[in-house]
Design a protein with these regions (language model features):
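NAD(P)H dinucleotide-binding glycine-rich loop of Rossmann-like/cofactor-binding domains
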Residues: 97-180
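Adenosine-nucleotide cofactor-binding segment
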Residues: 178, 194-254
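Glycine-rich beta-strand-centered segment in the early N-terminal region that forms part
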Residues: 25-41, 53-106, 142-144
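C-terminal hydrophobic helical "lid"/dimerization subdomain
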Residues: 2, 256, 301-353
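Rossmann-fold dehydrogenase core element
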Residues: 264-271, 281-322
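Short glycine-centered segments of the SAM/dcSAM-binding site in methyltransferase folds
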Residues: 90, 175, 199, 266-267, ...
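N-terminal Rossmann NAD(P)H-binding glycine-rich loop of SDR-like oxidoreductase domains
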Residues: 182, 190
Length: 353
């Protein structure tokens, strides 16, 4: 690796506006470590951090990027490393940051910590050759995975697991409508629904993406067009009953349809609002159909260990895997942001370092 560099947001702007800068990596403080990154993965949060979020002040200048994997290069004084993690070893990063000592953290609900934040959003992240993170946020990389796969895994699979398992208690045989099946979190959700015995109906923007959803295990893959026609098709596929769970992250544009296709007593869980945060809300439909609505943000860090244990049960034929659409060089991070914003790919966008 050559000279250290990172991408910085000095003022909010459009996708691709972070600028490359040389820097000298700092040593880690007690409880923290420094990684020499080998790969980082982009998420929608990179774009929102770059563009700015109305009403939210971020600590600029800031290096975006919440997913990453690399080599453990330095350890802060007195720092205890997680199981399977050692100096010089290959590790990936759990992106959620919390205080570790409040009641929520102590009972394992770290994403409910009052100081909870995400790497690359509240402190410098992984769009860099090196990054500082708490030691508790490290996990060993499965032996047969590349750094690119490891970087693409944590945020989307942790988010999807929290939504399906802990917010909605997905049961075998239940049907889940997955909006944006070609996104990172959508492609993770399709695989987890199948692995947990559910039936996924994916919604995507093209026939090519629909084919890839089927390959991941979706029972049906619908090309989004007219939303009323889509709603009718979903009800047809479910015997007019509707779906048990709606996996929402698209927001305002799809919310009325999510309400319409949700079965009586069904659940809608949301982790995002890509098309906007405000939408008309039919309270009568909510109580008449007894729909349960649940918000979800990231997930419990310990559940990444649960996901790793599921992978280790069958390493030659894993039940799920990160889907990577394209790999850029880190030097082309700005271009990678613009590519992600265009939304034409299927799966995760990754930068190798």
């Amino acid at each position: 690796m050559g000279a250290a560099f990172r991408f910085r947001i000095h003022q909010h702007g459009p996708a691709g506006s972070p600028v490359r800068e040389a820097f000298t990596p700092m040593g880690p403080k007690p409880g923290w470590v420094r990684l020499e990154l080998k790969a980082m993965a982009l998420n929608r949060l990179d774009l929102w951090t770059t563009e700015g979020i109305p009403g939210l002040s971020l600590p600029l200048p800031l290096t975006p990027g919440c997913d990453g994997a690399g080599t453990l290069e330095a350890v802060g004084e007195g720092t205890v490393l997680p199981p399977g993690v050692e100096l010089g070893g290959s590790v990936m990063i759990a992106p959620g940051l919390s205080c570790g000592v409040c009641p929520a953290c102590l009972r394992g609900d770290d994403m409910l910590c009052a100081s909870y934040g995400v790497l690359g959003h509240v402190c410098d992240g992984t769009a860099a050759t090196h990054v500082l993170v708490p030691a508790a946020n490290l996990l060993p990389i499965p032996g047969n995975w590349s750094f690119e796969q490891a970087a693409a895994f944590p945020l989307v699979f942790l988010t999807a697991w929290e939504m399906l398992v802990h917010k909605c208690t997905l049961r075998p045989g239940e049907t889940v409508l997955v909006w944006g099946g070609g996104s990172g979190v959508g492609s993770a959700a399709i695989q987890l629904v199948k692995a947990l015995g559910g039936r996924a109906i994916a919604v995507v923007g093209s026939e090519a993406k629909a084919m890839k959803c089927w390959e991941l295990g979706a029972e049906h893959a619908l090309v989004r067009g007219d939303l009323k026609a889509l709603s009718s098709k979903v009800r047809e596929l479910t015997g007019k009953r509707g779906v048990d769970i709606v996996f929402e992250h698209t927001g305002a544009a799809t919310w009325p349809t999510s309400m319409a296709v949700c079965a009586r007593g069904g659940r809608i869980v949301t982790c995002g609002a890509t098309t906007g945060p405000e939408t008309p809300f039919n309270l009568q439909a909510l109580f008449a159909k007894q729909i349960q609505i649940r918000g979800s943000y990231m997930g419990r860090r310990e559940h990444l260990w649960t996901l790793l244990s599921l992978l280790q049960r069958n390493p030659t034929n894993p039940p799920f895997h990160p889907v990577i659409e394209r790999v850029f060089d880190l030097a082309d991070y700005a271009e990678a942001q613009r590519h992600l914003e265009a939304g034409q790919g299927f799966g995760k966008v990754v930068c190798k370092v």
